[in-house]
C-alpha cells in the first residue's frame, strides 16, 4: 500500500520514507516522488514536479 495520499488528494508532503508509485500528484517533494531524481539540483528546494528527468522540464 502506498503510504502517500497522492492518488487521493493530489498532494504529497511526506518524508524520505515515503515512496509514491504514481507521480500524478501536484506537490511532490524530491524525497517523496521519483519524478524529482536524487541529486537533481533543480528539484532540491521542494518544487512541484512536472517531469521525470533532471532537466529544465523537471520542475515548474
Curated annotation (Swiss-Prot):
A divalent metal cation 1 binds at residues 4, 6, 20, 23. Belongs to the metallothionein superfamily. Type 1 family. It comes from Lithognathus mormyrus (Striped seabream). The gene is mt. Residues 1-28 are annotated as: Beta. This is Metallothionein. Pfam families: Metallothio (PF00131). GO terms for molecular function: metal ion binding. The lineage of its organism: Eukaryota, Metazoa, Chordata, Craniata, Vertebrata. Metallothioneins have a high content of cysteine residues that bind various heavy metals. It comes from the Eukaryota. A divalent metal cation 4 binds at residues 32-33, 43, 47.
Amino acid at each position: 500500500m502506498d503510504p502517500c495520499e497522492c492518488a487521493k488528494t493530489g498532494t504529497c508532503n511526506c518524508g524520505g520514507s515515503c515512496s509514491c508509485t504514481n507521480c500524478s500528484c501536484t506537490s511532490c517533494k524530491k524525497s517523496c516522488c521519483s519524478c524529482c531524481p536524487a541529486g537533481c539540483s533543480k528539484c532540491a528546494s521542494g518544487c512541484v514536479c512536472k517531469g521525470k528527468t533532471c532537466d529544465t522540464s523537471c520542475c515548474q
